[in-house]
UniProtKB/Swiss-Prot annotation:
<dbReference type="GO" id="GO:0015935">
    <property type="term" value="C:small ribosomal subunit"/>
</dbReference>
<keyword id="KW-0689">Ribosomal protein</keyword>
<feature type="binding site">
    <location>
        <position position="24"/>
    </location>
    <ligand>
        <name>Zn(2+)</name>
    </ligand>
</feature>
<dbReference type="InterPro" id="IPR001209">
    <property type="entry name" value="Ribosomal_uS14"/>
</dbReference>
<keyword id="KW-0694">RNA-binding</keyword>
<feature type="binding site">
    <location>
        <position position="27"/>
    </location>
    <ligand>
        <name>Zn(2+)</name>
    </ligand>
</feature>
<comment type="similarity">
    <text>Belongs to the universal ribosomal protein uS14 family. Zinc-binding uS14 subfamily.</text>
</comment>
<keyword id="KW-0687">Ribonucleoprotein</keyword>
<dbReference type="Pfam" id="PF00253">
    <property type="entry name" value="Ribosomal_S14"/>
</dbReference>
<feature type="binding site">
    <location>
        <position position="40"/>
    </location>
    <ligand>
        <name>Zn(2+)</name>
    </ligand>
</feature>
<protein>
    <recommendedName>
        <fullName>Small ribosomal subunit protein uS14B</fullName>
    </recommendedName>
</protein>
<dbReference type="GO" id="GO:0006412">
    <property type="term" value="P:translation"/>
</dbReference>
<comment type="function">
    <text>Binds 16S rRNA, required for the assembly of 30S particles and may also be responsible for determining the conformation of the 16S rRNA at the A site.</text>
</comment>
<dbReference type="InterPro" id="IPR023053">
    <property type="entry name" value="Ribosomal_uS14_bact"/>
</dbReference>
<dbReference type="InterPro" id="IPR018271">
    <property type="entry name" value="Ribosomal_uS14_CS"/>
</dbReference>
<keyword id="KW-0479">Metal-binding</keyword>
<comment type="subunit">
    <text>Part of the 30S ribosomal subunit. Contacts proteins S3 and S10.</text>
</comment>
């Protein structure tokens, strides 16, 4: 889990647009966040395996 202070800091409107960055909405992780789902890779994987993300299936070929 991310520090509460860092999550609060990120939610404030930034003075410059360049300073904004994505965070996982579930755990607050700042790295490897999928923009489309607003989830980090770890949370995405957990929810995908449980079938809680509509339209996502395990790949097989």
């Amino acid at each position: 889990m991310a520090k509460t202070s860092m999550v609060a800091k990120q939610q404030k409107k930034q003075k410059f647009q360049v300073r904004e960055y994505t965070r996982c909405e579930r755990c607050g992780r700042p790295h490897s966040v999928y923009r489309k789902f607003k989830l980090c890779r770890i949370c995405f994987r957990e929810l995908a395996y449980k079938g809680q993300i509509p339209g996502v299936r395990k790949a097989s070929w």
